[in-house]
Amino acid sequence: MSRPGLFISFEGIDGAGKSSHVEGLAAAFRAQGRRVTVSREPGGTPLAEKLRALLLAERMDALTESLLIFAARRDHLRQVIEPALARGDVVLCDRFTDSTFAYQGAGRGFDHETLSILERMTNTAAAHKDGLLPEPELTLWFDLAPELAAERMAGAAHRPDRFEAQPVEFFRRVARGYADRAAAAPRRIVRIDAAQECHRVRQQLRDALVCKGWLAPMVTPQGGAQ
């Protein structure tokens, strides 16, 4: 059995630019008549947003960090993601479980088996009534060299949060964690070259969705498809 909705996650290190492309894809789906739910992790519900504020500001060890993230995720799954998928929505989520394995696992060096146990507990508790676990059908991984990401963040106007303020070496480990996840799930995770200019990144995203048959190709004024 399959869910009526479609679940797409956006992943990448801080500074890769993924968040700025979520609304663009939402608009593309809406233009084709699809209902879209846009959300983020950690966050997406009143409770999860409170946990997000703690995670971004307060110092804590890797286990505490992981437990708070999975607590926020369970509430998010139950309150937002699963109801939206059951309605038939396209769910676009800025970060999901891959972030946890990349940041807390590879970045912090936290035990992957413990993360896997927490993942199973969280996802099984929020499983859809047909038994399907809430894993994205597609993950768009914005791959960018940590050094370039650091340059981009240095030019940002806002004050960096606790994760954004980590040293480049931390993000190198996180990037390797993402690469390992992509190698283990090549059909689900599509690499996006985030070093490209913005319009080329948008084209990569659209191409990935057209390839899946989820978006129609864009027709140019000359009558060709893109």
UniProtKB/Swiss-Prot annotation:
EC code? 2.7.4.9
GO MF, one example: dTMP kinase activity
Biological process (GO) annotations held by this record are: dTDP biosynthetic process; dTTP biosynthetic process; dUDP biosynthetic process
Which residue ranges run through the membrane? none
Q: Name one GO cellular component term.
A: cytosol
InterPro entries in UniProt: P-loop_NTPase, Thymidylate_kin-like_dom, Thymidylate_kin_CS, Thymidylate_kinase
Keyword annotations = ATP-binding, Kinase, Nucleotide biosynthesis, Nucleotide-binding, Transferase
User: Which cysteine pairs are covalently linked by disulfides here?
Assistant: none
Specify the enzyme's EC class, one word.
transferase
Cite the CDD domains for this sequence: TMPK
Q: Which reaction does it catalyse?
A: dTMP + ATP = dTDP + ADP
Question: Which family would the database say this protein is a member of?
Answer: Belongs to the thymidylate kinase family.
General function of this protein: Phosphorylation of dTMP to form dTDP in both de novo and salvage pathways of dTTP synthesis.
The record's annotation in PANTHER family points to: THYMIDYLATE KINASE, UMP-CMP KINASE 2, MITOCHONDRIAL
**What is the name listed in the Swiss-Prot or TrEMBL entry for this protein?**
Thymidylate kinase
Which organism was this protein described from? Verminephrobacter eiseniae (strain EF01-2)
Gene field = tmk
